[in-house]
Amino acid sequence: MFEPVPDLNLEASVELGEVNIDQTTPMIKENSGFISRSRRLFAHRSKDDERKLALRFFLQRLYFLDHREIHYLFRCVDAVKDVTITKKNNIIVAPYIALLTIASKGCKLTETMIEAFFPELYNEHSKKFKFNSQVSIIQEKLGYQFGNYHVYDFEPYYSTVALAIRDEHSSGIFNIRQESYLVSSLSEITYRFYLINLKSDLVQWSASTGAVINQMVNTVLITVYEKLQLVIENDSQFTCSLAVESELPIKLLKDRNELFTKFINELKKTSSFKISKRDKDTLLKYFT
């Protein structure tokens, strides 16, 4: 039915020289192993190398960590290099180990902070790879103390804020001694504000613990931040009647305003940074 086209009916002779496969040597950085690129984001020699490369990718977002803290987190990941944690999605193990290690040092991230600095973790909708599920799996595999990441203990979340506004001359890893008074004050305000909401039956019980904590912390942070901007603009002072045992260190906040602003702006970029006008108006009643 079909006739061959003469112009395309070509023949060619190809001569190959003698090649001894055993005598060939791979180029530098050439990997002799096969890695399916559909399953590995970073094609590397081992899963351990892949985790470290992933950690470097994620940690660059935590701009407020110094080189000693970053080195410490790499050592923590290196300590579990022979442990198989997940069959797939190996790169996601590194940021979870970092989060749990930072939490062991007294600093945790709210949902908004997680979205700001680890959006891949926050936006994971798979039931198997959801945040709480992954935390539980890694705690079990690595022998960490088992427990929920988000609990009604506000100090660790404000400790992360303190990390972000630290003085450049801080000594020691995850050292926030100079900012400890701020952590105590913000925590006290949040505890009392939470109790006020409980008594008024304003807490949304259908929401998760992480969501409730996120709402409380965001409301306190943005309220204090906006009051601080007014104080700086008008060269005045402000107090909060909920901070009974630990007054707000206004001078510290003024001195670190640039760092505080940078941190708040990172949170504002997220979709989870939503402030209830009712909650904010209620909290503002206690500021003078």
UniProtKB/Swiss-Prot annotation:
Keywords: Activator, Early protein, Transcription, Transcription regulation. The keyword Repeat does not apply. Induction: Expressed in the early phase of the viral replicative cycle. It comes from the Viruses. The keyword Transcription applies. Acts with RNA polymerase to initiate transcription from intermediate gene promoters. Heterodimer of a 45 kDa (A23R) and a 32 kDa (A8R) subunit to form the virus intermediate transcription factor (VITF)-3. Belongs to the orthopoxvirus OPG134 family. This is Intermediate transcription factor 3 small subunit. It comes from Vaccinia virus (strain Copenhagen) (VACV).
